[in-house]
Amino acid sequence: MKKLKAEMWDKVQYIFRNYYDGMIHCAIVYRGKVDETLLRRAIKLVVDKVDVLHSSFVAHPIDPYWRVNDDYTEEEMLDVVYGDVSHEKIEELLVRHVDYRGKLQFKATLVKESGDKSVLCFVINHICCDGRDFIRLTSRI
């Protein structure tokens, strides 16, 4: 089993997990058709390179760490929903929480309208990256 050392900020975020929203929330609007198969593949290529995105936080009382998970699939990385892109739907997808004990440290849903508009709703555990890292991450997808 591969482990990653938990940094001080990981531990602080874990301790305060019940007091504030430790997630980064983002909605990316696409004009034109989005191929969900290619998007899934792009997400997987990035996630494969960044171990913490496919790790579970183990809250060991003395020495917490990240357990790297290798048993994830492309299908788990992106949900696809068909229908109208409403503010209510986007908000519903953006207020979700990512469980630090889960296999993946993000949730991504592509909402595809019947026309040429799609919205990628992305929620990622802030422990994994800050805002600048998130911009770099999503620009590679």
Q: Which ranges hold each PLM region?
A:
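Acyl-thioester-dependent condensation/acyltransferase catalytic cores
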Residues: 40-139
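N-terminal beta-alpha "docking/capping" segments at the starts of catalytic domains
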Residues: 1-36, 41
